[in-house]
Amino acid sequence: MFESFQLNNSQTQKYADNFDITLPGRNISHGTLHPTTLIIREICDAFRSMGFQIHEGNEIETEKYNFDLLNIPDDHPARDQWDTIWLNLTNNENNYLLRTHTSPMQARIMEKNNPPIRVVVPGKCYRYEATDATHEWEFHQIEGLAIDKNISFSELKGTLYQMARKIFGSDQQVRFRCDFFPFVEPGVDMSILWEGRWIEILGAGMVHPKAVSYTHLRAHETRHD
C-alpha cells in the first residue's frame, strides 16, 4: 500500500521521510462509566453480598401501582399534575404516568412471590420538578424490599448499617430519625456524618399493613428497606 502511495508536495514528502511504520500504535482513549452508574452498581453489589436479588421495574406505570397499592390517598399532593408527569394513555382501566419512585415494584413483587424475599430495584424516576442545583425532573432511586417471617425493625437497621459501611467506610457514623412515608409504618430517614455535618441518604421503614393487605402476604411477615 505504501509503495503505491503518491505524495503531492515536498512538505508531505518531508513528513513521510520521518514516518516510522514500526512504531507501536497509540492507545485509543476509552470512555468511562458515569458516576451515577458507578454508585448504583456499588450499592447493588453491597446488597447482593447480603443475599438480595436485583430487579428492574417499568418506567411507565399505572396509577394503581404507583399510588393506590402503596397506601397513598386520593387527595395526596403527589397525585397532582404539578408533581406527577401524567401520560396521555388513559384507557378504561388505567391512568398511566412516569413513575415517581421505584416503590411500585413493591406491590408487583409481593403479588408474584412468596417469602422469603430479598430484592433491590434500581431505576430512573420522574417528577415535575423545577431544575436547580439539587432537583431535576429525572433522577435515580434504589428500592429495597425484604419479606420473611418474624423479621424486625432492628434487622432493617442492621441491613442499612452494613450497606452504609460498605459504601462509605467501616467506621462510618449513621443516625436514624422518625419520618413519614405513606407506605411504611414506622418510617425513618437515615443520615451519615460527612465532613462534620449530617447528610440524609435514604428513607426506610416497615411496610405498611395496608400496602401488604392488597397482596396475598400477611402483614407480620414484611419489612421494607
Say what each PLM segment does.
Residues 1-218, 223:
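TRNA-recognition modules of translation machinery and tRNA-sensing kinases, especially anticodon-binding
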